[in-house]
Each structure stands twice: as structure tokens, then as C-alpha cells.
Swiss-Prot record:
Cytoplasm as UniProt keyword: yes
Subunit and interaction comment: Homodimer.
Catalytic reaction equation(s): AMP + diphosphate = 5-phospho-alpha-D-ribose 1-diphosphate + adenine
Pfam families named in the record: Pribosyltran
HAMAP family from the UniProt entry: Aden_phosphoribosyltr (MF_00004)
Keyword Transferase: yes
Record protein name field: Adenine phosphoribosyltransferase
Species whose genome carries this gene: Lactobacillus johnsonii (strain CNCM I-12250 / La1 / NCC 533)
Record keywords, A-Z: Cytoplasm, Glycosyltransferase, Purine salvage, Transferase
InterPro entries given in the database record: Ade_phspho_trans, PRibTrfase_dom, PRTase-like, UPRTase/APRTase
């Protein structure tokens, strides 16, 4: 029987700011069976896309992507916030509603032609996805898909990537 993951996501009104509904995945993470089931679904998706490596943006992308990579037996590459990686890095900036931010990856993290699936907890405006995809492509990788626990469809992040296969466990249309 399929799991309705939406039943296990807590909706928190006015967090972190008034008028925002925060979708909290920690109830899934706190339940080993749910966490494993969510990981398994994303891993099945990544396998179907031919993923050779999983990339997850800091920080919740680590929580989502690492177990997917482990289940598939492939590597995991973190896309980190600035000044967190010790060797030479590639950088990409992205916009937020209140400013901008930067993600970095080691320059040798992705091999040319390597097939990559990006895993993260949530896609809203897709700024993080843009930056992560740009990093991977600048390093010669091929982004073959992106997988999320949650997609906020009203924010139209998916529409910015008409040629990218995107998978989400849960969709909310009342972002």
C-alpha cells in the first residue's frame, strides 16, 4: 500500500515569518519506516534516471540525498555554503526573496559526463535548484533529474526547467 507522505508533513503557520506556511519534514525523519520509504521512492526515481552520483544542497539536501546515494551504492556530493570546503571550488549564486546566496562544490567532485540527480527537501522558487544545476554543468556533469520530498507548485519552480525531469513525493498548491 502506498504511503501518503502528506499526512506526515507538519504544516506550521506563520513560520519563519507571518503569512508563511512552513512544511516540516521532521515527522518523516523521526519515523524510521517513513524515512526509509521516502528514501526508497527517491532512490527508485534516481535509479530510473541512471544516476551515477547524487548531489544535495546544504543543509537538508544532505539529509535527503545521502541515504538515497547509500541505497543506490553511488557517491554523494555536497553543494555547500561558502567557505565550507577546503579545496578549490566552483561557485554559483542564486537569489532568495530577501537577498542572494552562494553554493560551492569541489572542482573535482563531478566527472565530465557523469549523470547526476539532485536531491533536496523542497522546491519552491527553484533558486537552489538553479545554482546546484549550474555548478554540476560547469563541472561537466549531466543533470538527469531532480527529486524532492515537497514541491510548492504555486511558486512555479518546475516551469523554469521545461527540459528537466523533476520528481516530488508531495505537492502543495497553497504555498
Amino acid at each position: 500500500m502506498a504511503i501518503d507522505f502528506k499526512e506526515h508533513i507538519a504544516s506550521v503557520q506563520d513560520f519563519p515569518n507571518k503569512g508563511i506556511v512552513f512544511r516540516d519534514i521532521t515527522p518523516i525523519l523521526q519515523d524510521g519506516k517513513l524515512y526509509r520509504a521516502a528514501t526508497h521512492e527517491l532512490a527508485d526515481y534516481a535509479k530510473s534516471r541512471g544516476a551515477e552520483v547524487i548531489v544535495g544542497p546544504e543543509a537538508r539536501g544532505f539529509i535527503v540525498g545521502c541515504p538515497v546515494a547509500t541505497e543506490l551504492g553511488v557517491g554523494f556530493v555536497p553543494a555547500r555554503k561558502p567557505h565550507k570546503l577546503p579545496r578549490e571550488v566552483e561557485s554559483a549564486s542564486y537569489d532568495l526573496e530577501y537577498g542572494s546566496n552562494v553554493l560551492e562544490m569541489h572542482k573535482d567532485a563531478i566527472k565530465p559526463g557523469q549523470k547526476v540527480v539532485i536531491c533536496d527537501d523542497l522546491m519552491a522558487t527553484a533558486g537552489t535548484l538553479h545554482a546546484t544545476k549550474e555548478l554540476i554543468e560547469n563541472l561537466g556533469g549531466e543533470v538527469v533529474g531532480a527529486a524532492f520530498y515537497i514541491e510548492l507548485t504555486d511558486l512555479k519552480g518546475r516551469e523554469q526547467f521545461p527540459d528537466l525531469d523533476i520528481y516530488s513525493l508531495v505537492k502543495y498548491s497553497d504555498a
